[in-house]
Amino acid sequence: MRLYSGAILCTIATLLISVSTASKTTGSHLSTRLPLPIDKPENNSLPRFLRVSTQNTENGENRVISAGLEKLTDLAKAGVSNINLGSWISKDPPAEPILRRFKLTNGMDDALASPNLKALENYVKELNTQNNNNKASVIGMFMAHYGDDAVANALMTAQRAGGEMNTIQRLRNAQLLSWLQKRKSVDDVFTLLKLRSDGYLALASPKMEVLDDYIKLVISTKSTKDSLLKTLTKGFGGKEQLATILARAREDVKTRELALALQSALINKWVRVDLLRPKHIYKKLRLNRGLDALLDRNVHTFGAFISMYNAKNPNSKASLIDSFVAQYGNKAVATALTFAKPDDAATMNLVITLQRQQFLKWKEGGISANSVFRLLDIHFNDLLSPTNPKFDTLSGYLATLSNKNLLYNEGMLRAVSKGFGGEDELAIQTARAREHLIRNGYADLDEISIATEYQRMLFGRWFKRKTKPSDIYGTTFRSSENTASNLERATAARYKDYYKEHMAPPRIDTSINPRR
C-alpha cells in the first residue's frame, strides 16, 4: 500500500533503457559537484575554462568566462549545430555560471518551467559530443547548484503536476542513475534527500517516492535486502524513533495511509521475525518511564503490537492496560486516567480506550462499585466543586457493570451513598459541604456543587418513598428532632422546603388571551 499521489517513475527495465538514451543528452559521468571559478587548487592557480585566453590574472579569467558563456548562450539558442566547442571551452564546465547565463538560478521549479532548459540541454548535448572524457550533465549541474534533495523534490512535484513529461522523466531517470553510478547506497540517498529533518512529514514528501524508486532500482541491479522500512528505520535513528515518527504521522491525514502501512510492516517484523514479546516492546517504546507515558502516542503502536501478537499467539492474554497496571498499580493508573486532560482527540480516544479496558478487567475480577469508590479515594472535599472526574470514572464503571448506561440518579446515588457509609452519612456530608461553601463565601458555587446535586437526589428518593419531613429524623438519622445534630436539622429543613414545593398543586394559568 502506498500513499503517493503520482505513479511510479517507470519499471526498472524502462528506466534502464530510457537512461541509456538520456545519457546521450544529459550525461551522467559528471562528479557530484562541478568546480566553480572560485575553487582554487592547492597551487592557488585557477583552472582555465576557455581556451581563447592565456591571461593569468583572476580578472582576466573571469572576463574570458563571461565572454565565452555569452557566446555559449547564443550558440545554444541557435541549436549549437556544427560548432566545435572544444576549441574554446574546457572539459570541466562550472555549474554556477552556466546556469546563471541560461537564467536557471531562480529556483528549481522555475528552472523546470523555463524555455531555457531546452537550450541548456542542447548546449550539454553538443558539449558532450565534442568532449569524450568527463561528460557534463544537466542533472549534475542542477544537483551541484540546488542540492540533490531540492532537485528530487522539484522533479517529483513537477511530474505529479503534469509538467513536460519527457523532460521531467528524463531528468528523474538521470538523477537515479547518477546516484547508482556513484555507488550511493539507499542510506546515502536518504541522507542526500534530507528526509530526517522533515520529521513525520517526510512521509508526505515527494522525496519519499524518489527514495522508494531508488530502492527498487538498487534491488533490480544487485542482490540486496534493502527495503523502504529498513531504510527509514536506519535513517530515522532506529526502530523506536521510527515508531514515534509513525505514531505522529498516523494523526495527520496527509501521512496517515503510508504511516499505517509502515507501522503494520514494522510490527509484523517485531512479531514474526524478531519474535519480540509485549514486555520487550513496552520497554523499547519507553512506556516504562512514568505515568505520563499513558498519554504517549506510542501507546497506539504498543496496542497494535499486542493485537498482532495475540493473533499469532492465541493463548496469550496480553493487554494494553495490564502492562501499565503491572508496573504502576491499579490505583495509580486509574487516577492518572481519571485526571488526564488530553489536548487532542486522538489522545482523548486513547484515554477512553484504556479506561474501558480497565473497567472490563475490574468487572472480570469481580470488583464492586464500592471497591472502585474506595480506589478513587472519593471523600468530603470532592463534593465541593461543580464537577469532579472521579464521579465520571465511577459512573463509567457502573455502566460497564450493567452493560448499559444506568440512569444517573439511580445507579450513582446508590453507589455514592454506599461509598460514604449510607444515606444518612451522605446526607450529613452534603449538608456539611453546602455550609462550608456558604461560610467561606462561595454561595454562588453552592447551588451548582456536587454536594447540592446529591442532596437533591436524596430528597428525590425520599419523596418517591413518600417520606414526610417529620419522619426524616427517625427513618434516616435514627434520632429525634430534639437530639438531632445541627447538620441533621439543616438537612431536614431543606427537605421540608423540597417536600412543600413538590406537594403543592401545579399552578394553572388563568389568564385570558383575547383572540386577535
From Swiss-Prot:
The keyword Secreted applies. Its main location: secreted. Residues 1-22 form the signal peptide. It comes from the Eukaryota. Keywords: Host cell membrane, Host cytoplasm, Host membrane, Host nucleus, Membrane, Secreted, Signal, Virulence. Induction: Expression is induced during host plant infection. A motif (RxLR-dEER) lies at residues 48-63. One of its GO terms (cellular component) is membrane. It is found in: Secreted; Host cell membrane; Host nucleus; Host cytoplasm. The RxLR-dEER motif acts to carry the protein into the host cell cytoplasm through binding to cell surface phosphatidylinositol-3-phosphate. Effector that enhances P.infestans colonization of Nicotiana benthamiana leaves. Belongs to the RxLR effector family. This is RxLR effector protein PITG_15127.
